[in-house]
Amino acid sequence: MRSIFRSIVLISLVIAFSLTGLGAHRHRPVARVTGPRELARAIDALLTAPEAAQAHWGISVTTLDGRLVYEKNDAELFAPASNAKLFTTTTALALFGPKATIETRVIAAGAPDAQGTVRGDVTLVGAGDASMSGREYPYNGTTERPNPPLSALEGLADELQRRGVRRVEGNIVGDDTAFPWEPYGSGWGWDDLQWSFGAPVSALTVNDNVVYLAIMPGARPGDPATVAWNPDVAGSYYSVENSARTSTAGSQPSLGVDRAPGSKQVRIFGTLPAGEPSKHLALAIQDPAEFAALAFRQMLEARGIAVTGEAVAHHRESADTAIYEQSVLRPLVLPDSRDTAESIQIAPPLPAGAVVLASRTSVPMLEDLTVTNKVSQNLHAEILLRLLGQRFGTDGSIVEGARVVRAFMRRAGVQPQDFFFYDGSGLSPEDRVTPRAMTTLLRYAASQPWSEEFRGTLPIGGVDGSLSDRFTRAPLRDHVFAKTGTLDEVNALSGYVTERNGRTLVFSILCNGHLPEAKGIPRTIDAIVAAATGADSVR
């Protein structure tokens, strides 16, 4: 979920990590277990390894009908990292249904006149569609981003051109007021906010609110490094202070990139050896609605549509003065779970007298939930949280979304004292959950009419998503369906696994407080899963 990068990307450090093989630790094959006592001994032995012994572990393993197979500290609270997404995505699937869609609109105060002139602002209105990107849908595990980053926005510009718009006498406005302007969750690290995994949350989202920066060495030592943006409009949005230089071929790269919170200046510094491949980074967009307006304005002008005004953003500042920890506990009555055959559409309100010049409908909800869980997409989970608050609470805010999730967890049988979330993605280090809450939720999901759809959103061991390089050998390959979670000193895995005898187990393994250099923790987690199923090894 979270990159190892801090405020400054030290590419030399990344290279050093890959060369030294810090992730190459291997466990011995797990001893075959035949009963609860043997399983407890096997897991306890795994947790006595030096890296694991220094950390704090919470484990819950149960059958689908709730019988306890193994537990360790399962009633204690842990930081879940991206395992928090399980709470957000199950709630969204149950309440919205798999077929729900979201509409983005381009509106104006009136239709174009006979000459194709629109008098007044043209407004791009977002309603929380996270699929406005170059991402491939449905998720296929290989070609995640084959399309141009702004292809969805280009389609809206094409629609205006087909409609005969020739001139806009006003501004191009990016409107994200469907949600209050709360771009970040509580406790998010300031050094995360410039990267893709910490992108700001907006009801008007394009390309996951991310642009791509390529940094290339010059021809000779001493030459300036060169930069290129994708999409090109990012070069108009961000300014670059570039002091990076080309170093001698074969020398160690030492390249840094930095953007201060709230700033639109990107600083590039350090060295990149001659002949070195380009370095590619995904940078968060500071203000997605403003960026979308700027990109849309340029697209219209590229199609011969004159625009007299500027590209501006329209936000709605939060007016909530209540204490979050109190507000989120207010009771809420939810509707019944959505029938899987039903389909609802979420659309922004249309002001009186306004006309829709163009519109775009998102992919079905299930397709986006799959991306959210498979690749652990933070922004998409945060948008889901706000959509839940908007539709089933009183506003598209963090606290209202959290109220909806909390109310749904009561329905799922999760004890209210067993979890507390400050966001929808798990990026907040302040989030807390017990392992037993995880397995309770997963058992509930397995009992619902949408259980197969939900399981299909999870990474599959050895096959796809964040588990593509774990559980790569039989019998666990293709038999582990689980959500990963990673933050500083946090590692987690929760989901389903099939035993040798065909029985499905539900598990949650939460590890907190390990040392940053403890690269073997995921291997320990995988070995615990293997022990629970009686598998000989995980690879």
How would you name each of these model-derived features?
Residues 73-78, 282, 425-428:
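A short glycine/serine-rich beta->alpha loop
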Residues 66, 85-92, 172, 204, ...:
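Residue-level preference for non-acidic, small/hydrophobic
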Residues 8-18:
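Bacterial N-terminal signal peptides
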